[in-house]
Amino acid sequence: MTDIILEIKKFISESWTNIFMEVCNAVVYIDHCAIECLHWYTAGKSYLTLKDAGAAAVYEIGMYHFQYVEVKDVKKAVIISTSSDPTFYQRTIKMILTKNIFQNCIVYCSVPCCTVNHLGSSIEEKLNYNKLKKDIKIWMTSRNLSQEPVVNIIYAPIFIAFLNKNLFVTPPFGDLMPPLDTNILKDMVIKLNFLAYSFYNLFDNIKARLDIYSVGKFSDHLAENLEDYISNINHQNHLSESPKVGISLILIDRTLDLCTPTSNNTESFLTKILRTFPRLPNHDNDVAINISPMFGKTVSKPYIKKKLLGIANQFLNDIALTTDNSKLRTPSRISGHSLEKFLNKIQSTNNIASLAIHMEKLQCILAIIEASTSQKASQLELLTSLEKLALQNLSVSRESSSILVQLSNIICTRIHRGLDIDNLLALLIYIYALAGTQIQFSAQQEHQLEKSIANAIFEDLQILKKNPLINTKSAYQRTLLLLGVDDVIVAQETSCRIAARFINILRLVAEQRLILQDYRFCMLKPSSQEVIRHISILEQIIKDIFDVDVNRKLRDLHKKSSSFIQASFNLFLRGKTKRHPRDNSYILIYIVGGVTAEEAKIIQEIVSVQEKHSNKKTPYVILAGSRLLNPLDIVEKIFF
């Protein structure tokens, strides 16, 4: 049987290999999303890989990056972009070429030429390779070249970053989030069409037959676009080659379940790390770990999972054995404190050069220590306890729940508690998403909540007015700063308007699962003896797919026919049982809007149990999403 993981990785590798062959003695300009894809492809060595391939220099490009320096004594430029906006290419490439004298220019585009990408928006809104090529030649010729410039524009489908063998993200589509209402903005339609073509090209390249399912209106739209590509292009090409392997592609709207990505109550330590550390600049799926604690002391307290403690302790022993041939004494109880002590001992007896070869292990150790001992760790513990309180309150009291009153009081005392409004907004999204339409909050409670939020916004406006220079600004803080409100009365009125808007958005969050029939509830109490818990829609869907005893139709999974010919065959197969997602060898679940580390962990556990107890061969499950999410990402996408 074809190994789909291997085939997808070959597909990714082919694009990068072709690019590496062209960068020798060239200046490379690469955008943020392509950098992130390359970062994961090269295991964090994107810059070094390009330099090793012979690149004379490497520069990042962005929509609003105008500081392109002049590069002397280099005659070739290689530009790598994942943008779907034609004006981006016109503006950015023109600025690069007006500052340099290049004889040769190669542009790698992740978006196909408009003559291929025929669906969706108008031809003017798509990238025309021929027009862009002519424009580039004009810009290059204006620099008084001694000979005719050489220009090539090449389609390079760069959009996948594998985080591990069972999980990948799509950085160029990291900003996609299904709208809470039914209005899909024009730029979203273009992006969705771009994603559909990218998926089509991938599955066509690896010769896969798709059974497409969608859950949610945004995913329905994506599924229709993808099916249109499969039907129209395959029909034009007369289906020259038969598919090798079947894949059940399940597309799910993130907004149907906003409880999971806003939850802090998680068993996944990766989630804790993602919540603790800042992201790498312009990355959505990786964090930056400060290595400086290796050369100074850190404050620690004992809190960490036993398994991770043991792994970290073993890492330190491995480093000690390879640097000074001495084994560290394993304490009776491994703690964050003992890890810190061992780390300081190794640091004091070794130089930087000897430690540098263990950089990856040291980063992991520092991540474990920092994620469990930082100031954020205690804040996350408090948020987790509030989340548990909300879950219990909603499950027991339901309509008579006083959780909004309690949250209103917490918002008023947030500074004293060491909490910020961003995290409390995430908690409110969690509560409204969890309640859905089954639990209605009283108008009085919502009015009190709105008033508390308005007061908090006003207080934050005054704080930012006094101290505008904050190093790390959240989307919430940036929004308040951009308002530029100086007058107190205006600030109060503005705060009230923002608070009212927040409440309206929260009501929309609660209504997201109204379109579903089987997955409207995200609270589960298995038995009277067990504690109620939050259960994600993804977990419910994958369990239903694997449950062979469930005879009912999966009503919320909307099935799309996988090809033009299959639609014809269905006329002759009406008496045959409809295909089920588990009928294929592979199941690929893509969450439009992003996926969490906790969801990846849950899927892995469910599949592991299924493989252990099932008599039949279990489909291989791959989880994917627009990006890796944490609660504050949801706050930014939903409110701002």
Explain the meaning of each model-derived region.
Residues 1-640:
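Extended, well-folded catalytic/binding cores that form a central cleft or groove in large enzyme
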